[in-house]
Amino acid sequence: MLFLLSPAKSLDYDTPLPPGLAHTLPPFIHESTQLIEVLREKSPQELASLMGISDALAGLNAARYAAWSPRFTAANARQALFAFNGDVYEGLDARSLDGDGLRWAQDHVAILSGLYGVLRPLDRMQPYRLEMGTRLATGAGANLYRFWGKRIAEHLNQRLAADATPVVVNLASQEYFKSVDTAALKARVIECVFEDWKGGRYKIISFHAKRARGLMARYAIQHRVVAPRQLEGFDLEGYAFDASASAQDRLVFRRKDAG
């Protein structure tokens, strides 16, 4: 079973890492290098327009692309699970996981990425900004979905090859999950939906839903979840499985009071 996460825009390369933290390298360094070469051709102004970001952010990322190297070291990179710093990753709270938990996560969590394709939790990554929905034209086509093609699905298939009944639990946004060619994916896909009570009904509230995706990943790591039925036990921060609102491959978790 694999749990898919989106990356985060916010990054943390300052907080000291846990001592003795293991590291691995991303599987698609060659492809990332190709994308960096395309990005380096663009001015900060072009990046601002392409990505819909401020001039200051465009300048920062132009500098990141210029500094990017196909050699990943402790000086220029850090493990993905500790580099991303957003709502999802606050819910996951990697720093509180023990070594066994991190090793389990390494085998069962996959972070989708516009620049890196897929990252394992302990894969080193250099800082970047490149959302999967960016219309960055390459030799493969008009956007990153065309660039990545079937690569991400095939990578996930390889990671699931030893499973008798391969399952992907999608905790990523639709923007990122769209990068997985489901026609090429040889696995059942289960979507987890998190709803909060507001205005007299249950609805998806972005901030809470993002955090809940991280909480679900944390729950899976802590409980070593390897079967879909185990997901129904998720109960962190007041959420509970609602069978009446769920379908076989769409599990709905609801919370009455966010507190």
UniProtKB/Swiss-Prot annotation:
One of its GO terms (cellular component) is cytosol. GO terms for biological process: response to hydroperoxide. Belongs to the UPF0246 family. This is UPF0246 protein Aave_1172.
